From Swiss-Prot:
Designated name of the protein: Large ribosomal subunit protein bL27
Lineage per the UniProt record: Bacteria, Pseudomonadati, Pseudomonadota, Gammaproteobacteria, Pseudomonadales
SUPFAM superfamilies on file: Ribosomal L27 protein-like
HAMAP family: Ribosomal_bL27
InterPro entries: Ribosomal_bL27, Ribosomal_bL27_CS
Gene that this polypeptide is encoded by: rpmA
UniProt organism field: Pseudomonas aeruginosa (strain ATCC 15692 / DSM 22644 / CIP 104116 / JCM 14847 / LMG 12228 / 1C / PRS 101 / PAO1)
Protein family according to the UniProt entry: Belongs to the bacterial ribosomal protein bL27 family.
Amino acid sequence: MAHKKAGGSTRNGRDSESKRLGVKLFGGQAVKAGNILVRQRGTKFHAGYGVGLGKDHTLFAKVDGVVKFETKGAFGRKYVSIVAA
């Protein structure tokens, strides 16, 4: 009898596509207005001087300059700012 019994079915075998989040331009790097600095879920990083916040919490440069990361305030919030080159 050359028959093979049916194998079981698995409930695994799927995964979501990665969202490519994270810091895109690091401290000390030169940027132009419109460049994306950080892609994030929620405000892990807050917008400082010269930085805008998109509706999906993406941080982007509003002016030309150099990226600066800093921690400020009583809660230790991380801010991303643009300083003049």
